[in-house]
Amino acid sequence: MSTSRRIRRRGDALVVAFTALFCLGIGDAKGGPSISWPTQSWHQGTPASVGLDEKTLASLDADFVAGKYGLVDSFQVFRCGEEVFDRKYPHDYAGIYGKEAKSRGPLNARLTGPYNYFDPASHPYYLGTDLHSMQSVSKTVTSAIFGIAVMRGDFKATLNTPVLKYFDVAKVKNVDHRKRRMTLKDVLTMTTGLAWNEDVPYDDPRSDSSLMEATDDWVQYVIDKPMATDPGTTFNYSSGATELLAYIFQKETGQDIEAYGEEHLFAPLGIKHHWKRTYLGVVDTEGGLYLTGADLAKIGYLYLHDGMWDGRRIVSKEWVKQSLTPFVDTGWQGLKYGFKWWLYPRKDGRRFVWMGIGFGGQRLMVFPEEQLIATFTGWDILKDPAIDAELANRLLPAVVVARCQGDAHK
């Protein structure tokens, strides 16, 4: 299956259409409301108070309510430190996926536990809370935690460090000169060179991601894969690559990546979370994080401010810059990839919309020039919702004041 099929499986048709409005360009209105910090909670505002057109957002909301774009659970918009649009769309997932929840398959290789994706106890919300599965947006957050450890000196290895440094090579299969050259940077940019098939849907028995999740030892499954290309040369989306980071983080720092993230990222930003673990207790950094849409937006807000949060340095400006650098072309519709961030090119080809994207309809979208953040959650895990190309034109008038006061991205 092509890269485009894989991205569509994550609900990115909606992402691309929504970002298209900003690829068309925004007017030159000056000034705007000042920014604030949402550590305890987002200040509540209105679209008009931050220079957005409410009718444009309400039109999209109406289509979500009507089911035009599939099983969307939430749609939230943030600007200038305020939450200005918040809509939830309840669904009876126990009824929708009841049959699938009882039949073993690639998305529920184990009928009980957190890796039955049809089980309403843990999907899409965690145990009746408002914490929603982030799926592969977890990768974007993992990258942030990794960068924090680098900045603080707790992760001392350079990005050119070979991945096999952290393994007993005698116990790793398919070792060759290419696998020996695979580096941490290759893992961060999805250019490991490993033979990995995530081009098929996750309910396809050939999916390496689903096959990995059916095993006890995810890390061993990944590192044992043969090489297909030279590392650092070819983008190949691999959830397994990000799972390696949880293992490598513990080996390098001696600390659990979730506990480290709680202390140095989640607590300072006021983020509550749940994080699934593999059957061997390794943090599921490839897709196991649960957040609210409002707390997910804080990650975008942190990156909008170059890693600063209310006067405190959380992650280095250099890591933010590297994370949002287009290191590799994904091979689909101009999308580039940084350190676990998807980068969608704007009209001028030099600037990007920053995105975290997850299976089922999870997405974090950041528009730096406009200081605008949008989050979406959903649980459309069996079908690929379509979207009208005209959606971009419907949303273009939403930004009527170009920037917030105090905008670092003028």
What are these regions (language model features)?
Residues 2-16:
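Bacterial N-terminal signal peptides that target proteins for export
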Residues 19-126, 150-156, 216, 394-410:
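N-terminal leader/targeting segments and the immediately adjacent pre-domain N-terminus
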Residues 53, 58, 81, 112-113, ...:
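Active-site SXXK
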Residues 87, 97-122, 160-164, 203-230, ...:
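Short, charged, amphipathic alpha-helices and their helix-cap/turn boundaries
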Residues 122-124, 128, 151-194, 224-226, ...:
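Active-site helix/loop module of the DD-peptidase/beta-lactamase fold
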Residues 143, 241-248, 287-308, 362-378:
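Active-site-proximal alpha-helical segments within enzyme catalytic domains
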Residues 272-273, 320-375:
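Active-site Gly/Thr loop motif
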Residues 356-410:
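Structured C-terminal helix/loop/strand segments within mature extracytoplasmic catalytic/sensor domains
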